[in-house]
């Protein structure tokens, strides 16, 4: 089952800003986010406490997202990079 990936405005804005600083990392990050459509809970992703939020680390990049099984959606909440 393929999920629909939805980017929240804050995540899109931050991704665009970080893409200017690290184009190669941004390309890999975008690829990983697209892959969440096929596997919303990949190996290496961690659930944050008992919440519905998940974090995925990719080198210096972090992706905070929320898979919603009832609507078959993955909502990308925030994208960040470790300084």
Question: Model features per residue range: what roles?
Answer:
Residues 31-57:
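A short, surface-exposed loop/turn module that caps and links secondary-structure elements
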Residues 1-6, 16-26, 56-62, 66-83:
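Enriched for short, Lys/Arg-rich terminal
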């Amino acid at each position: 089952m393929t999920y629909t990936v939805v980017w929240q405005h804050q995540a899109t804005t931050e991704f665009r800003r970080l893409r200017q600083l690290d184009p190669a990392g941004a390309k890999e990050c975008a690829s990983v986010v697209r892959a969440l459509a096929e596997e919303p809970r990949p190996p290496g992703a961690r659930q944050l406490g008992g919440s519905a939020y998940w974090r995925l680390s990719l080198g210096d990049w972090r992706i905070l997202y929320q898979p919603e099984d009832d609507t078959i959606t993955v909502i990308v909440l925030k994208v960040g990079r470790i300084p």
